[in-house]
A protein has these predicted regions:
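Eukaryotic scaffold repeat domains enriched in small/polar residues
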Residues: 1-82
Length: 82
């Protein structure tokens, strides 16, 4: 499930730090991963939320990545079928 990393926009010196993962939905059908975007000096410049949803009926998967900056502005918002 690392194909979403190609959709995130990182500046030079920035990297992703995994914060936490959890499942949600009435049948735990959606996996959510939260990341911080960290500069080389250790300060946080944004956040990334990745969701991997498996439809209960049909078992289709939809991936969604949302990247925001420190002000909350959306930098990336993409969804696709896996």
């Amino acid at each position: 499930m690392d194909e979403w990393k190609d959709k995130v926009i990182l500046k030079e010196g920035e990297s992703l730090k995994h914060d936490r993962s959890f499942c949600q939905g009435f049948m735990q059908e959606e996996d959510v991963e939260l990341y911080s975007i960290v500069r080389s000096d250790g300060s946080v410049s944004g956040a990334v939320k990745v969701t991997d949803h498996t439809a209960v009926n049909g078992f289709r998967r939809t991936l969604h990545v949302v990247q925001t900056d420190n002000e909350g502005a959306t930098v990336v918002d993409k969804s696709w079928r896996a």
